[in-house]
UniProtKB/Swiss-Prot annotation:
Keywords: Nitrogen fixation. The keyword Protein biosynthesis does not apply. It comes from the Bacteria. One of its GO terms (biological process) is nitrogen fixation. NCBIfam families: PRK00810.1 (NF002009). This is Nitrogenase-stabilizing/protective protein NifW. Homotrimer; associates with NifD. The keyword Transcription regulation does not apply. Pfam families: NifW. HAMAP family: NifW. The lineage of its organism: Bacteria, Pseudomonadati, Pseudomonadota, Betaproteobacteria, Burkholderiales. Belongs to the NifW family. May protect the nitrogenase Fe-Mo protein from oxidative damage.
Length: 121
């Protein structure tokens, strides 16, 4: 196993990756988006072509570019807009629950539990 790969396997947090690659970052951005940044970095790595034949120096340079881009994505956008994780892809901002349906649901639960009924306001 090459030296770069061995060193990368020892890293676990977004902060560690950014520091390893010498990428300046704002802690508030990383704190909120750490998993999103790493997931996006992973996505960029899998889409990148020609990484297999690179030496450690060139691979470090390419990985650094991809991680910097992943971080940058979240300095100018949000996790919801970037939709890195499936939960954001599926939601697509369309979730809607009416107050009436919540009231009806709660009334049914109370009724089945033997509690007092709710009255509509």
């Amino acid at each position: 196993m090459d030296d770069l790969t061995t060193r990368l396997k020892a890293l676990s947090s977004a902060n560690e990756f950014l520091e390893f690659f010498g990428i300046a970052y704002e802690e508030r951005v990383v704190h909120v988006n750490r998993l999103h940044i790493l997931k996006r970095f992973y996505q960029y790595l899998h889409r990148a072509e020609g990484l297999a034949g690179l030496d450690d120096v060139e691979m470090f340079r390419r990985y650094r570019e991809l991680l910097a881009q992943a971080y940058q994505d979240f300095t100018t956008s949000t996790a919801v807009k970037e939709k890195v994780f499936k939960v954001f892809q599926d939601a697509d901002g369309q979730g809607h629950v009416s107050v009436t349906s919540l009231r009806d649901s709660l009334a049914e639960r109370r009724k089945s539990a033997g509690g007092p009924e709710l009255r509509a306001a």
